[in-house]
């Protein structure tokens, strides 16, 4: 901030503290040194106030807060451009420096443990109980907001506990997904195949997983199959089982990221979808991602209950 505003904040802060000290001392003058049964002379609804001095503990508490405030403003940045003199923080304390200090301490304490697991194959790490506990905590802190605390996903966010993987479920593939993220784009087709085509393809796609067309809706499954063969097989494959290299889902199973109702599939066909998994390398680093990949991999290796 500019020098003017720095001095403004400084003088205002110190002036306020000085005013409070003056008020405290001024009101203390003239008070009785000892307690008395006399009142100040006024009564409200039968309630009278004794003419006694401020309790000493109350007065000392007030003084203590003033001393604390002055000490705080000396140690921490609170007076304009004053950076404070808190030991251990070159150039003054800041939230960023405090965070970095805590991170450095944590890395010093846990870094060797992360490095130990990073040197092991993901499959082997996935069998280590301590590693899974650490990976679970990383997941809860960084991934559960999208995939859920139980990792079973939600609308638009995949379930990580089954064996259905858009980009592949091999350990190193999972690690790559977490490290670098994924960008999946499903184009909209309403301007290409029209509303009738959307309806027919939706009916055909639902039929691939054994779903019937809702009553009252007329579709041409054969025509939908032709449109699918002409436009959709390049991503989803000729058998509609998906292509992991492109993140295109299998349309013949019962796993639906954006819903399997007739209306939801039409919505997907009409306007497309744009799914994005953010990269975590810059946030977590390779060693933590390695541990997290092992945890995610372990979720789909557990026997069904």
Curated annotation (Swiss-Prot):
Keywords: Cell inner membrane, Cell membrane, Electron transport, Heme, Hydrogen ion transport, Ion transport, Iron, Membrane, Metal-binding, Oxidoreductase, Repeat, Respiratory chain, Transmembrane, Transmembrane helix, Transport. Heme c 2 binds at residues 186, 232, 235-236. One of its GO terms (biological process) is oxidative phosphorylation. One of its GO terms (cellular component) is plasma membrane. Binds 2 heme C groups per subunit. It is found in: Cell inner membrane. This is Cbb3-type cytochrome c oxidase subunit CcoP2. It comes from Stutzerimonas stutzeri. The gene is ccoP2.
């Amino acid at each position: 901030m500019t020098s003017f505003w720095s001095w403004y904040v400084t003088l205002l802060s110190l002036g306020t503290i000085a005013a409070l000290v003056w008020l405290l001392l001024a009101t203390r003058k003239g008070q009785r040194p000892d307690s008395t049964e006399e009142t100040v002379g006024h009564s409200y609804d039968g309630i009278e106030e004794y003419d006694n001095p401020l309790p000493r503990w109350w007065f000392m508490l007030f003084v203590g807060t003033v001393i604390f405030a002055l000490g705080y403003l000396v140690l921490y940045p609170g007076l304009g451009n004053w950076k404070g003199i808190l030991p251990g923080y070159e150039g003054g304390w800041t939230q960023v420096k405090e965070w970095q200090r805590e991170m450095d301490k944590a890395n010093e304490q846990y870094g060797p443990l992360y490095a130990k697991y990073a040197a092991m194959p993901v499959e082997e790490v996935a069998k280590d109980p301590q590693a899974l506990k650490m990976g679970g905590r990383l997941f809860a802190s960084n991934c559960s907001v999208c995939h859920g605390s139980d990792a079973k996903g939600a609308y638009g966010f995949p379930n990580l506990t089954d064996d259905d993987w858009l980009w592949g479920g091999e350990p190193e593939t999972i690690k790559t997904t977490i490290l670098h993220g994924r960008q999946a784009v499903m184009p909209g087709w309403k301007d290409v195949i029209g509303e009738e085509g959307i309806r027919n393809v939706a009916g055909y796609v639902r039929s691939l997983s054994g779903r019937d067309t809702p009553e009252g809706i007329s579709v041409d499954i054969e025509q939908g199959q032709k449109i699918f063969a002409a436009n959709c097989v390049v991503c989803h494959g000729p058998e509609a089982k998906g292509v992991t290299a492109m993140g295109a889902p299998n349309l013949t199973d019962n796993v639906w990221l954006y819903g399997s109702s007739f209306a939801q599939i039409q919505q997907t066909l009409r306007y497309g979808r744009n799914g994005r998994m953010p990269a975590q390398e810059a946030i977590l680093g390779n060693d933590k991602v390695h541990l997290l990949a092992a945890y995610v991999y372990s979720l789909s290796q557990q026997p069904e209950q």
